[in-house]
């Protein structure tokens, strides 16, 4: 048998060069797997990418009542990805994005990490953001509900901190395609705290995340939820789309069902994972930075997403040691009870964001 060539054939090399030529600068930096995922799942076609973007941009004239403050290619592209390249749906989301900001001006005044309300929420761990992505390349966000000190943080400021965090994260084109998952730990969340979740503020959150933000949410997972969190379903149901209800899962303390969807190696020990307990200040230090000063405006238009990566890589070297703020889990980390799902276990989807 003759020698086996490890070099690509002229035909395969030509195909590879052709595929590479089709890539636009808007896909630069994406891994080959992510580019293929965008093609298969989102209908992203590099041959007509710029035409798709322009078709959305051409629709802006139909909504003179909305101030479209940003319309560059990269910005519009994230809305197309969020709506699987259905141009009309992408434009509707783009319009709702700016309309939501027009209707809630106070929420977006001083919309940066050093705003006192946003800063307090970030420092208190709203949201938590894990450094590593899951097996599908999704970014994992955490909310430890019992850490909500209502004398310190308003629900609106927590929502602002979450939206600002998403604005920073969505700059990464990999996350525009792979998306996010959210885990909410309801351990020790009191009935008194739950009573503050009024229909109006829940509606505000749903409109901001479900209807007005270009993120793909692969799931919202409730852990250790009490009975009165189940009761919230009747409050939020009128605000939900039918499709949306498929993406939140109520796991209770059944971590087996959680681990079937998110592998333990990607989770901190609070959720039965193999990672160390989550440090509640990690994401706040990432956004604010060890060299933070008043000159830094971390807004969704001026924040340099590369600063996040730089800061993450230098946290240990540049940050002074800080005591780790822990979640208020009912049980100690690493000892959460694994229960087999019974016939009556409520794992029905409750709420989802698409």
Swiss-Prot record:
What InterPro entries would the database entry show?
CRAL-TRIO_dom (IPR001251), CRAL-TRIO_dom_sf (IPR036865), CRAL/TRIO_N_dom (IPR011074), CRAL/TRIO_N_dom_sf (IPR036273)
Where are stretches of biased composition, namely Polar residues?
A: 345-354
Keyword tags: Cytoplasmic vesicle, Endosome, Golgi apparatus, Lipid-binding, Membrane
Asked if Oxidoreductase is a keyword of the record, the answer is no
Domain of life of the source? Eukaryota
* Matches recorded under CDD domains: SEC14 (cd00170)
Q: Name one Pfam family in it.
A: CRAL_TRIO_N
| Compartment(s) of residence | Golgi apparatus, trans-Golgi network membrane; Early endosome membrane; Cytoplasmic vesicle, Clathrin-coated vesicle
Its domain comment says: The CRAL-TRIO domain is required for targeting to the membrane and for binding PtdIns(3,5)P2.
- What is this protein for, i.e. what is its function? Required for normal morphology of late endosomes and/or lysosomes in neurons. Binds phosphatidylinositol 3,5-bisphosphate (PtdIns(3,5)P2).
| Assembly with partners or alone | Forms a complex with clathrin heavy chain and gamma-adaptin.
Protein name per the record: Clavesin-1
Which source organism does the UniProt entry give? Mus musculus
The gene coding this protein: Clvs1
